[in-house]
Amino acid sequence: MSNDAVQRSVLPIPDRTGVGLTTYDAKDPDTSYPPVRELRPPAGAPNVLVVLIDDTGFGASSAFGGPILTPTAERLAADGLKFNRFHTTALCSPTRAALLSGRNHHSVGMGGITEIATSAPGYNSLRPNTAAPLAETLRLNGYSTAQFGKCHEVPVWQTSPMGPFDNWPSGGGGFEYFYGFIGGETNQYAPAIYHNTTPVEPERTPEEGYHFTEDMTDKAIDWVRQQKALMSDKPFFIYFAPGATHAPHHVPPGWSDRYKGKFDAGWDQLRKQTFARQKELGIIPDDAELTARPPEIPAWEDMSAEMKPILARQMEVYAGFLEHRPPRGPPDRRASRP
């Protein structure tokens, strides 16, 4: 369908109908009909990839002066923009609902996480039909759409394999393909996975090296390759939301061990170092002042000798979980990937 002829102010975009007399005469050499034209986005419409990392603070990633190495984020930041006043709701479901709809979270029924929904307006975890999700808007404009990873926007009473699926990614959420889990968290070694609305088992066991972040990444790579092979002229929208770094902090030991001893000085020293690096990077103003440590958080020097190694190890595991970069696939498939 010609982009110039498409009226995109109403969704779904009305079907194009032929004007004039329709005849069905096999003997008439002049019998013809309007060609079937598949809907496409406007010329030059880009591919869109949205990555949402869970429970990651402003000062965690090295891209923002944090102590945790995130080289991919650094490369993206070097070629793009970094925002230092990008606000979230500081809650899981509300932030996701706002991001995926472009609306205030109360406007889409997500004033709190789905597990504490009530019948109060703005808090029932039900997105109204008048609020179209971003993925649905793009899909109805000719995009291919897919979601991978965590989905925490489904009302708790609708999370079974029997639905209803109006608030699921591949139901009413606008995503043609979904591979991930429903809810706030899942075991990263033995996750409860859905393919669209069907429960599926991981292809490997933890003993065979399975990890959900690597699995969902592999599925996303496969989906993009299929998309480019079969519909290279059609742009795509991918929403990629791993379970990291929300609890449980499940990460292969090789990743968490990279940070052995890195946090032994404690959080008081760590926050000062991060603050200084953020000034060096220009992320915060030179005259910014470090906020006082909240009284609810004890000073590191007040922690007992028994607790310090435990708390430092928790920080090491978290750091490894954030840095964890999934491989291209299991060993028997890596050779086929560039």
Per-region residue spans from a language model:
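Formylglycine-dependent sulfatase
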Residues: 1-338
